[in-house]
Amino acid sequence: VSWSRGLGDVYKRQLSIDIDYRTRSLKEEKNFFLSNSPVSKLKINDIFSIHSNKTSVEDKVISVKKRNFVVKNLSNRIARFQFNEICGDNRGTEDYLELIKLIDRLIIENVPNFGNTNSNLQERFINLIDILYDNKIKLYLSTEKEISDLGSAYPVSYTHLRAHETN
């Protein structure tokens, strides 16, 4: 692949094999849930409880460029956020890089169906997913729709794969 071509060209071609080896580990532990399901909410609560090892939950304040970023629900290197708390404010790469120093696992709840009206949220979400992927942080999401069905103002099919690969 020539880097002089746009990245969009890289993701247009489909794999011509029967097994997508990048998603094999998805069967081992579920990490995507639908927001409107009561069962999903219970499972996310269980994930947080198990991985926090029932240690005390705290809020931690990170200061980045004279801005405060509150990491709510932090316990035993797992953090839990509502989507708007982590992507809704003016967050950037520096915020997310500071966050990953504190965690090995991240739960993001209530990820909306993206459309053409919230492109800033989508950019922050894509940036966060890339940082989590690059740093091997395990991700759990609850979304309005299946992650592959989330609408987008951008061609973000590779983001779906990266989100799956954060296992």
For the regions a protein language model found, what residue spans apply to each?
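Conserved small/polar residues in nucleotide/adenosyl-binding loops
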Residues: 6-14, 159-166
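Conserved helicase/translocase motor-coupling segment
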Residues: 67-115, 119-123
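Hydrophobic/aromatic beta-strand patches that form the interior of the parallel beta-sheet core
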Residues: 13-17, 81, 140
